[in-house]
């Protein structure tokens, strides 16, 4: 789903308090991720692939943070679909070591798929 659950909103509210510090000008990247299962049912009508779904997740978080007072110019949304499973490092993804076989292995049970349906918030360097 792309809808923000109440517990996520509470967490983002706390995080937004840190992100609204006027002295902090770092960029903030919001990453959306999915498992390797294609969207189904009603969600597939709006988000036919995991690329659209992961991008929409990230965009919803960005919109919520802007609503909470974070400067929009600091925020970037990016969707990764299933291409960056939980536990894979930046260098593994960038070097091509995370291929369809690895992605399948990292989505082989419900717990792994749940872990892969996530948002990451990354702060730039000061």
Label every model-predicted segment.
Residues 1-23, 33-126:
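Periplasmic OmpA-like peptidoglycan-binding domain that tethers envelope proteins to the cell wall
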């Amino acid at each position: 789903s792309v809808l923000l659950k109440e517990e996520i909103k509470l967490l983002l509210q706390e995080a937004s308090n840190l992100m609204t510090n006027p002295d902090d000008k770092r960029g903030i990247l919001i990453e959306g991720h999915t498992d390797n299962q294609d969207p189904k049912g009603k969600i597939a009508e709006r988000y036919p692939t995991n690329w659209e779904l992961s991008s929409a997740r990230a965009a919803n978080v960005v919109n919520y943070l802007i609503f909470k007072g974070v400067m929009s110019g600091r925020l970037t949304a990016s969707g990764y679909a299933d291409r960056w499973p939980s536990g894979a490092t930046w260098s593994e993804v960038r070097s091509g070591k995370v291929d369809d076989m690895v992605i399948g292995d990292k989505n082989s049970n419900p717990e792994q798929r749940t872990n892969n349906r996530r948002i990451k918030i990354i702060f730039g360097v000061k």
